[in-house]
Design a protein with these regions (language model features):
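Interdomain hinge/lid region at the active-site interface
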Residues: 1
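Nucleotide-sugar donor-binding patch of glycosyltransferase catalytic domains
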Residues: 31-32, 39-40, 71-140
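Donor-binding and catalytic core of enzymes assembling or modifying cell-surface/extracellular glycoconjugates
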Residues: 4, 8-82
């Protein structure tokens, strides 16, 4: 809700991208929102996703394939990193801010081997960190 208020107050709209497997998570997230977002989960193949992202002024994403699609379209991003290492996986662009909880175990997913059960790398990340990163990118 805090993130949406920040974005709404600036006149931006929220768009959710993702595959069909993301629809339940997106439905849950939209339940916390005061204004209706654009829901585009399950609507695009890779080329369509690239074209749709190109129209965005900022993408907030996790370390995923769509993050790299946004980068390929030269869209500024806020990339949330959990267990994977941004030095290894990118983003390799000046148009990105990386948000991480910086747990002592970061990098445990290198080679796709997750070695913890509590995912401190995700649970310690805050809305405030992501909002601050988004504001920084939107001010550029």
């Amino acid at each position: 809700r805090q993130r949406q208020m920040c974005i709404r107050d600036r006149g931006y709209k929220t768009v959710f991208f993702g595959g069909p497997m993301d629809e339940e998570m997106v439905a849950e997230a939209t339940g916390y929102m005061q204004t209706r977002p654009i829901i585009a989960t399950g609507h695009f193949a890779i080329g369509g996703l690239a074209a749709a992202m190109r129209r965005c002024c900022l993408i907030i994403t996790n370390d995923s394939g769509p993050m790299h699609v946004a980068i390929s379209q030269k869209v500024p991003i806020v990339a949330m990193y959990g267990p994977s290492n941004p030095k290894l996986y990118g983003p390799y662009t000046k148009d990105a801010v990386i948000v991480t909880a910086q747990p002592p175990c970061q990098g445990c997913a290198d080679g796709m081997k997750h070695s913890c059960d509590d995912l401190q790398c995700m649970s310690r990340m805050t809305v405030e960190q992501v909002v601050a990163a988004a504001e920084k990118m939107l001010e550029k």
